[in-house]
Amino acid sequence: MATVRLPDGKELEVGSGERLEDVARRIGPRLARDAVVARLNGRLVDLDLPVDGGGELEFVTADSPEGLYVLRHSTAHAMAQAILELYPGSKLTIGPPVDDGFYYDIEVNGRISEEDLPRIEEKMREIARRDLPVRREEVSKEEARRLYRDNPYKLELIDEIPDERVSIYRQGDFFDLCRGPHVPSTGRLGAFKLQSVAGAYWRGDENNPMLTRIYGTAWPTEKQLRAYLKRLEEARARDHRRLGRELGLFTFAPEDVGPGIPLFLPKGETLRHLMEGFVREVQTRHGYQHVWTGHLVNERLYARSGHLEHYRDAMFPPMRDGEVSYRLKPMNCPSHMTLFNSRPRSYRELPVRYAEFATLYRYEKSGELSGLTRVRSLTQDDAHVFCTEEQVQEEFARALAIIREVLDAYGFTDYRVRLSLRDPEGGKYIADEEKWGRAEGALRAALDAAGIDYEPAPGEAAFYGPKADFMARDVLGREWQLSTIQVDFIQPGRLGCEYVGEDGERHTPVLLHRAVTGTTERFMAVLIEHYAGAFPVWLSPVQAVVIPVADRHLEYARRVREELSEGGLRVEVDDSPNSMQKKIRENARQKTPYLLIVGDREEEAGTVNVRRRGEGKRQTEMGLRGFLERVRGEVAARR
């Protein structure tokens, strides 16, 4: 006999060999029906596991984040089984759960297009109806290699597993190399939908074979699936790539200019200017000084900072000038440290706060490029604060105030903080235990002092230090990583940053890396989708369009534009040959905040007929001075 303790403190005696699914049935039929896995002594396990040792026990249902993860993982297995039944001879690789769904990369024996997805879905439903038990087996690596003797992808994975035994999950005739856990049977899969087909290189390496990647989503109920698909439809309507084209904001010319290099049209450049100007204004108010450090950097600087060793794959190839190799700049911090080192520093000067809107270049793989969210040419709202260890909390609070003011102005008030830490087992970090410990301690203390709740995320730190990432939700509830604050005890020492302390001795400053919106391009994509292209008045590239009723009113329309433009508004005149009604429709599609209709009456009175976005055909006659003050008020309030 053994004893298990439930979350409510109740204890249960379990017999030898009794399985977790049996314990769930003893507690109640509803729990037995809803549980997908269990947490036993802090570890997620399958329900058919015997409870021989006892301990702390909690059952996990599909409506919890962990249960949903398991449900989606199991649905990926069902999809893989369906594909093997429909396309015999196909080779499985990996099929993990991801945000809102799952995918599986497969070397398909044949070809799968999106037209084939309904047939695969139907086969998955058939597998669910079979209600096949899902069982875990542990086998030797030798046995696993025998099972996968014709699958080089799985053999590669098996060779990388450090243990002598590996786990296999079986359901009917299907089996897959997997750590698990999984749902008890295929009848517990819930509602699912296959969504798209794409190409993906094995392990993301362009030198490896191209595989077929099939994406899907899975939810506990049909109602939840329908709600998600509705949100997805809304997201497609807000897709920044489509809206950016329709609103004349940006374009791409991959053949002429290159993939991943966005080109901004006049309205897009205006939007960039407004976004960056807002951040510049706020951080100037908080004591930051703006600098400029160019586009090219001697490669030796990145060797000293550690970037060349840890970041080389994300850099463009070097350009050689005699004995010197230059790199397109992928980050600003080494250049800002060079500025700090340009003259002797005293403790009286600290903190020194540098900010820069710098164009950076990162060699993203072509398959990972996506609109403005993943580009090769990007503009980062980067800042670096050189301070003493005692000033870290105060400077963190200052950076936090900037982040909050900017995100709040855009309506991002629902965000959480992820504390990205080093994974001690990972090899991608600069090795210095003492400095890592001090950096993590300083960042935790700063978060605690600011009263911020945070979730640790091991393995997500930068190679030189921990960071606090601000994860914000947009109007559709989607989460985006926007702002970040990093604490760095390592790079300043590597690049020789020093100041003379109050004691007359030389000291190395602490470096805070800080970004408010991340990159201008990615944040613009987020804003386009957040607002569905209907930017608030202060942010709209064009705030008003003057529409003449007839050609004879064009001269007055241009005088209106001139007066409002002199007052600081961004105004255009629609002098196209279209009818007035078509002009109204076309400019409404451009999501212009104000349409100003002018005809005989308005010209005689010196007024405009104002039609505001979102208010239908309602019009209000206003004098130019009154309209100007109205818009100025909205801009001042950032509405």
Curated annotation (Swiss-Prot):
Residues 1-61 form the TGS domain. One of its GO terms (cellular component) is cytoplasm. Its EC number is 6.1.1.3. It catalyses: tRNA(Thr) + L-threonine + ATP = L-threonyl-tRNA(Thr) + AMP + diphosphate + H(+). Its cofactor is Zn(2+). GO terms for biological process: threonyl-tRNA aminoacylation. Keywords: Aminoacyl-tRNA synthetase, ATP-binding, Cytoplasm, Ligase, Metal-binding, Nucleotide-binding, Protein biosynthesis, RNA-binding, tRNA-binding, Zinc. It is found in: Cytoplasm. Belongs to the class-II aminoacyl-tRNA synthetase family. This is Threonine--tRNA ligase. It comes from Rubrobacter xylanophilus (strain DSM 9941 / JCM 11954 / NBRC 16129 / PRD-1). The lineage of its organism: Bacteria, Bacillati, Actinomycetota, Rubrobacteria, Rubrobacterales.
